[in-house]
C-alpha cells in the first residue's frame, strides 16, 4: 500500500513509475490500480537483478525504491548498482550499501541510523514526517472533539489473525459510556472474522461491519474515537486526529503501541495475546470516552506527528538522488 502511495506522489511530480514484484498478489494489485509491473515471481534473486537491469537500462532508470523484509544486503547492493536505490526499512537494518534509507515509523530511531551510517553517503529519511500515507490523508486537520462519544471505529488492519476485532467489539458492547454509541468495525480484505462480526451485528443493531471500505479518511473522520492495531492504519488515524486506543497484533507492534502511548498519541491497550487484553481495552476505552480533555490532547498530538505529507517529502528527497538528467523514471 505505501509503495502505491509513494508511486502516486512521484506521478504527481510528472515522473513515470513502474513496479517489479516478486509476489503474484503484488503484481495483481499494482496492475489493478493502473501501474505497469514486471513479474519476478519465478526468479531467483540473481535473476531478478538481471531482469530489472535488462528491462530498464541505467540510462532510462532514474531511481529504485525497494520495500520487502526479504531483501538481503547483497540484493539491495545489486539494485544500487543499476540505479540509486532507496530502501524502506522497518527493522533498523545496519550498514546497507545503498543510496537512501526511509523509516517513517513512530519507532524509528534517528540516532541508530546516524551512528550506523556515519561513514555512508546514504540519505537518511527517518521519523514520522517521512511516513508514507495515501494522498487522501494529506492536509487533514484534527477532527472536532465532541462532549460525548457517539461513534467508535474498530480496526485490525488488513487481516485479523487472532480475531481481535471480534473480542474488541464484544468488549465495547459492555462499556458503559458507549451504551448509546454506534460501533463501526472496518474489516480488512484478508479478515477471517467477517462472518462472526456479522453475527454480532445481527444481534446488536449498534454494530456495523464494513469490508473493503472506500474513502477511509472520510470514514475515520466520521468517528469520535477508534480502537486500532499498531500498524499503518494507526498512522492514518493519527493523520486524521482521531483519538485512539492502540494495541499490538504481532510482536513487531508492541514497541509501536508503546511509542504511540509514550508520545501521548493514543492509550496502550496491550497485546492481543495478553491474558488481560479485553479488560485493558475496556479500561482504556472507558477512560478515553469519559474524558473530552484527554481526547482533545491525544487528537492534537497525533495529528501534529503524522501530517500526511510524508509521501510527498520522500518523493522530493529521493528525486534529488536520481541519476537521469530528466529524473523521469522510477
Language-model features, listed with the residues they occupy:
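Donor-nucleotide binding loops and adjacent catalytic segments primarily
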Residues: 140-141, 146-223
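A short, well-ordered alpha-helix in the C-terminal region of glycosyltransferases
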Residues: 287, 293-308
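Conserved donor-binding/catalytic loop of nucleotide-activated donor transferases
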Residues: 221-224, 238-247
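C-terminal "capping" alpha-helix adjacent to the active site of nucleotide-linked donor transferases
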Residues: 276-293
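Active-site and donor-binding regions of nucleotide-sugar-utilizing enzymes
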Residues: 2-11, 15, 19-119
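C-terminal alpha-helical cap of glycosyltransferases
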Residues: 307-330
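Acidic donor-binding loop of glycosyltransferase active sites
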Residues: 221-233
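A nucleotide-sugar donor-handling region in carbohydrate enzymes
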Residues: 97-163, 194
Amino acid at each position: 500500500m505505501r509503495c502505491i502511495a509513494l508511486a502516486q506522489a512521484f506521478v504527481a511530480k510528472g515522473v513515470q513509475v513502474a513496479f517489479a514484484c516478486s509476489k503474484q498478489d503484488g503484481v495483481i494489485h499494482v496492475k489493478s490500480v493502473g501501474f505497469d509491473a514486471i513479474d519476478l515471481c519465478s526468479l531467483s534473486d540473481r535473476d531478478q537483478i538481471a531482469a530489472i537491469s535488462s528491462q530498464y537500462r541505467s540510462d532510462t532508470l532514474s531511481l529504485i525504491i525497494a520495500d520487502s523484509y526479504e531483501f538481503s544486503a547483497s540484493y539491495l547492493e545489486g539494485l544500487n548498482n543499476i540505479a540509486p536505490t532507496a530502501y524502506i526499512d522497518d527493522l533498523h537494518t545496519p550498514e546497507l550499501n545503498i543510496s537512501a534509507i526511509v523509516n517513517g515509523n513512530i519507532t524509528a530511531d534517528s540516532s541508530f541510523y546516524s551512528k550506523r551510517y556515519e561513514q555512508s553517503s546514504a540519505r537518511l529519511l527517518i521519523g514520522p514526517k517521512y511516513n508514507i500515507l495515501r494522498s487522501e490523508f494529506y492536509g487533514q486537520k484534527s477532527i472536532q472533539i465532541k462532549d460525548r462519544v457517539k461513534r467508535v471505529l474498530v480496526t485490525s488492519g488488513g487481516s485479523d489473525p487472532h480475531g481481535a476485532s471480534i473480542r474488541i467489539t464484544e468488549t465495547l458492547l459492555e462499556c458503559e459510556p458507549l451504551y448509546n454509541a454506534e460501533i463501526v468495525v472496518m474489516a480488512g480484505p484478508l479478515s477471517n472474522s467477517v462472518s462472526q462480526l456479522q453475527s454480532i451485528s445481527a444481534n446488536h443493531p449498534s454494530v456495523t461491519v464494513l469490508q473493503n471500505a472506500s474513502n477511509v479518511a472520510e470514514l475515520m473522520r466520521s468517528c469520535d474515537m477508534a480502537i486500532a492495531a499498531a500498524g499503518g492504519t494507526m498512522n492514518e488515524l493519527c493523520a486524521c486526529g482521531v483519538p485512539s486506543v492502540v494495541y499490538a497484533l504481532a510482536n513487531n507492534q508492541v514497541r509501536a503501541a508503546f511509542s504511540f502511548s509514550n508520545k501521548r498519541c493514543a492509550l496502550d491497550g496491550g497485546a492481543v495475546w495478553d491474558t488481560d487484553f479485553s479488560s485493558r481495552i475496556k479500561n482504556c476505552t472507558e477512560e478515553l470516552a469519559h474524558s473530552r480533555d484527554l481526547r482533545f490532547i491525544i487528537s492534537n498530538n497525533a495529528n501534529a506527528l503524522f501530517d500526511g505529507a510524508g509521501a510527498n517529502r520522500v518523493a522530493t528527497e529521493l528525486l534529488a538522488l536520481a541519476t537521469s538528467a530528466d529524473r523521469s523514471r522510477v
